[in-house]
Amino acid sequence: MAMTNREKFKVLADQIKISNQLEQDILEQGELTRIDVSNKNRTWTFQISLPHFLSHEDYLLFTHAIEEEFKEIATVAIDFSIKDTNNQDEFALKYFGHCIDQTRLSPKVKGQLKQKKLIMSGNVLKVLVSNDIERNHFDKACNGSLVKAFRQCGFEIDKVVFETDSTNHDDDLASLEAHIQQEDEQSAREATEKLEKMKAEKAKQQDNNESTVEKCQIGKPIQIENIKPIESIIEEEFKVAIEGVIFDINLKELKSGRHIVELKVTDYTDSLVLKMFTRKNKDDLDHFKALSVGKWVRAQGRIEEDTFVRDLVMMMSDIEEIKKTPKQDKAEDKRVEFHLHTSMSQMDGIPNISAYVEQAAKWGHQALAVTDHNVVQAFPDAHNAAEKHGIKMIYGMEGMLVDDGVPIAYKPTDRNLKDATYVVFDVETTGLSNQYDKIIELAAVKVHNGEIIDKFERFSNPHERLSETIINLTHITDDMLTDAPEIEEVLTEFKEWVGDAIFVAHNASFDMGFIDTGYERLGFGPSTNGVIDTLELSRTINTEYGKHGLNFLAKKYGVELTQHHRAIYDTEATAYIFIKMVQQMKELGVNNHLEINKKLTNEDAYKRARPSHVTLIVQNQEGLKNLFKIVSASLVKYYYRTPRIPRSLLNEYREGILIGTACDEGELFTAVMQKDQSEVEKIAKFYDFIEVQPPALYQDLMDRELIRDNETLTQIYKRLIDAGKSANIPVIATGNAHYLYEHDAIARKILIASQPGNPLNRSTLPEAHFRTTDEMLDDFHFLGEEKAYEIVVTNTNELANKIEKVVPIKDKLFTPRMDGANEEIRELSYSNAKKLYGEDLPQIVIDRLEKELDSIIGNGFSVIYLISQRLVKKSLDDGYLVGSRGSVGSSFVATMTEITEVNPLPPHYICSHCKTSEFFDDGSVGSGFDLPDKKCPTCGNELIKEGQDIPFETFLGFKGDKVPDIDLNFSGEYQPNAHNYTKVLFGEDKVFRAGTIGTVAEKTAFGFVKGYLNDQGIHKRGAEIDRLVKGCTGVKRTTGQHPGGIIVVPDYMDIYDFTPIQFPADDQSAAWMTTHFDFHSIHDNVLKLDILGHDDPTMIRMLQDLSGIDPKTIPVDDKETMQIFSGPESLGVTEDEILCKTGTFGVPEFGTGFVRQMLEDTKPTTFSELVQISGLSHGTDVWLGNAQELIRQGICDLSSVIGCRDDIMVYLMYAGLEPSMAFKTMEFVRKGRGLTDEMVEAMKENNVPDWYLDSCRKIKYMFPKAHAAAYVLMAVRIAYFKVHHPLYYYAAYFTIRASDFDLITMIKDKTSIRNTVKDMYSRYMDLGKKEKDVLTVLEIMNEMAHRGFRLQPISLEKSQAFDFIIEGDTLIPPFISVPGLGENVAQRIVEAREEGPFLSKEDLNKKAGLSQKVIDYLDELGSLPDLPDKAQLSIFDM
């Protein structure tokens, strides 16, 4: 008997193993009505009928299970039909995102669509969009594909239409949203309960020191013989097995409780995304949670094109964790690495120092050195990592050593330059080493009295074939040298021809090296002739030139150079250049060979020296400080294209430092290539140890034929070892590591390729991974086992043992000393408190002062308060208000010492006359500013209203021992004065800007990776690009400075006790030096003042100057001012006129679209509610999805939601919780750590409502109330001027805050301006950043115009350079507001018009330097009404 459709469905459900996961009615009433099979296309289409819609998660599970089951047979498609579609309105919204993903729309369009709201009307799905442009765009893009996707899921949808959203949604939408909102809240509650349960289970597991699943294993075991490299996966396949290491994990929970798991793995041939849906009632999730980044897995599944990311991914059916033996150092005796580069080696090293230290510790190495290029910025992290892993850290640096002065004249003789005879010569050779290469051409000309009087030109036979490089460079071929004489004959003849003439050569050290080597081999000894180097001479007398190559100089001197790199042509060109240089020297007062070095060498001579690499290793604590001094001098005093270390500087500070020879760019390695052994051994005596590195690291020199072969390289090693023996210093093998593992090399290649000017771009990068002991021993096996062991193991360990334990960062805070600081802070606090509250202070004031002063004085923080007080006082004395940031307003002592205007006491009244006071400490009032006006019951005067109810604990912690972080907002234009005042307070050498380190960001790294792959013609899938991006991210790119951070060094120490110093981004013209270490590294060791710049104090100052009103006298509770936060009526305009429901355009903190929407939702009427808004808008997950929903649902109002972090502590204490528990809860919540069981229990015991607990759990970050109160206070003052003194306000706003102006629109009538704003709103999604900035200005201008004021065009006679000025009921814009016109030109126009009126546009261009584009703009603006193009010549001018 044939099976029914329902029986077929049950069989199918059993076969795909989801019977126990489907709802009972689905299992019983579901029908498999048909299967359409296409053998040609290998597709099976299942026709399935269901009684009602599946939940979206069950739908995904069901379809995925079918696809997995039949994937090896065919590609599966499923068409659903649904019998009961009455609730399809509800399910359409849930399926919407999935159906979008099934279309072929671009990812961008898909993302935009998913944000839209829906309305079901019969069988028509309406998608609400913002404007007509969006409507047309989506309508065209979807083209029926969305309907098809919905119908395939079983929806009876005939049409999808896109409609422009109106401000008033209809009842259907409201009802639907309410339903969805209710469901979301239920899901949120369930998720919270699950989270608490999971936390409890996790805690229980931790207590028992066990895990639910120790090793991931899902599905069938995977046969290792089926594994294929990821790079071989290039198309969709039914079944593939791979293995790789995880570098990213994403677990996303679905509403059903199941998860979708996404792993990114790599086998270092390529990378791949692996996906899987966890199964219901299975422990898949526990298995996946056992995985972590860095673990290896073996996975099997179907390779398919992911329509969303448009890339191949694996839909896993099976996965298992596997063990991969990590790289090990199996040597019994381990080496010590003395040459290693971290991510602090700018755009060169890859891992941070912590990764190296962890690896070295795992390998059993006893010590490790860090030697970044030119910097020591890894030291703090190195110290922390070494302490953590129990390894000895050796601190060092690879620097750039230069001689203090490079001679221009060698072996100077008493010869008059005018009368002397010169031999200008050049050699062409088989290579660059005078020790291993040979001369193939020697050419010279003899010069006397400014004329060439003789020539010498000879080839010599090297008896070896020339390399292609030399042939291409010199155009000399083997045939040309076959019959040439021996070099001995050529040099003998040349020596006789030269006589006692002075040698002249371009880069003479190279040419003379070959001459002297040749002479010595002939037994002549080195040349005794005087020498002049035209390269160094040009660098000295032509300092304005950026280049000094022969080609460049020939052009500059007008000398013909027909064939560069042929000796005779180079020689003749050099001779004619030198003849002109002799004349230049005469003009500089140099007439004798003896005078050249004396008169031409100056203090900048170090700039001419060629830097050699040198390794500096800190031996003890004194050496650390000396290294800090060396680093600082190289970055500040001797910086020229790169930090340089003059030899004299190194000698001065070498105590406690071991000096090594570094790499192939070191002085000693170069000497081995260029000088004889006696000279090499002489140079070696300057050093404390000699470095040799694996042959692979010199491969680039061999590729460039600087080292001709392995035999030559072996000779170089032996000469270096002999030099060490002669100088009695150890020779050690170093790895010059730039990354951890071989497969990390690609990241370094990408970084180097991103720097076009980097010389490493011209060569093959060597293998520079962190080598094990056995790897190093293998690298040096050619020296013999005994010698290899000596330099790799014995010598490195002996050297490490000579180095003491060094600590690069301090373990406590060192604050400046100010005599009498404790007494002054106490006296100042009480003095000002008595001025405000009277001689008989209220007990609440005394208690608060004593509590704070005990903490401040007891922990040594008085000086910090006193410094801040003096900085603020100086600013106030100079006429600029200061706004406080952060939590300093939580301190009543800060209020009484006038560091902050925020008063943290509970709300209260004070009488300025008789000092009567009344406090409200029961939580009934949010802010003192909200108290009703009241007369003093004692004397009848109007009472002052104060107090924001902020606990002190939010500033210095519950015990009051947290180092105070006082952030102050100075006027942006006054900030430099405040910074410089710290030099007056402490001394120039005691204050520095807080340094920062800028690293490669993810987006930047993505650009580097894409650029590299494109240049190399390589295509990689997205997962591999992500891996490469991760490898490049975090590498140091530059340095900078904190915008307002000033580091203060105490008078009993100097900066080098803490950190080296430098200029930000190595900008030698910067006004301030910065700390070399990132300021976070020394944050707990030295005082950091946050002297920040802000627009609000600047704007307040301008408003004060315009109006004469003292901002401190402005009433904070002015009703008309407060009204603009809920509507624009007090501005005299309507919502329709200004296209906004509030009047807060341009009001700090309340002018953005996001906050204006909050104001519309909440309609605040009090200061405390504005503080709530400020806190809510700056927090993370405090407003959206949290307080916003609570207010909308009517659960609580604006005043009772959690807005600022301090609210939690205050509320919970009023509720009855112990202060310590209230504080602890606040700290947990504000850091996004949720609530512990102990906190929940305490809150419930004190009847804290459930919504409050739920709200706490959602919060990720919270704003301090003191910060919010300070911001709001400034905002209300500025808003007061906007309401009552509008032209002053608009003039100040446009001058201080606005930056992008559309003056042509702004001078139009109010209707035109409003239409432009409205049009820009309709196109908002398509606007760029600049257009959005213009829109912000036009919103203000539209409001100003509708208030009856207008903007004039630019006036050549009246406009100022930078400030908007008032004329009647209009504003006149400044020149700086003209697009494309800079500050200098704006100032120049003002200066030029003072000399007389502009006669024409040509005159304007000539006097003020205006471009034609700017003149045309001014013309269009109507600013040049009577100005002719050119001045007319009058008879009276003749």
Curated annotation (Swiss-Prot):
GO CC term (a single one): cytoplasm
Enzyme Commission no: 2.7.7.7
UniProt KW Nuclease keyword: yes
Entry keyword set: Cytoplasm, DNA replication, DNA-directed DNA polymerase, Exonuclease, Hydrolase, Nuclease, Nucleotidyltransferase, Transferase
Keyword Transferase found: yes
Matching InterPro entries: DNA_pol3_alpha_NTPase_dom (IPR011708), DNA_pol3_finger (IPR040982), DNA_PolC-like_N_II (IPR024754), DNA_PolC-type_N_I (IPR028112), DnaE2/DnaE/PolC (IPR004805), DNAPol_HHH (IPR029460), DnaQ (IPR006054), Exonuclease_RNaseT/DNA_pol3 (IPR013520)
Annotated compartments: Cytoplasm
Domain Exonuclease positions: 422-578
Location (main, coarse): cytoplasm
Catalyzed reaction equations: DNA(n) + a 2'-deoxyribonucleoside 5'-triphosphate = DNA(n+1) + diphosphate
Domain of life: Bacteria
One Gene Ontology biological process: DNA-templated DNA replication
Single Gene Ontology MF annotation: DNA-directed DNA polymerase activity
A Pfam family reported for this protein in Swiss-Prot or TrEMBL: DNA_pol3_a_NII
Gene3D superfamilies: 1.10.150.870, 3.30.1900.20, 6.10.140.1510, Metal-dependent hydrolases, Nucleic acid-binding proteins, PolC, middle finger domain, Ribonuclease H-like superfamily/Ribonuclease H
NCBIfam families registered for this protein in UniProt: dnaq (TIGR00573), polC_Gram_pos (TIGR01405), PRK00448.1 (NF001688)
HAMAP family listed in its UniProt record: DNApol_PolC
Function field: Required for replicative DNA synthesis. This DNA polymerase also exhibits 3' to 5' exonuclease activity.
Family statement: Belongs to the DNA polymerase type-C family. PolC subfamily.
Name under which the protein is recorded: DNA polymerase III PolC-type
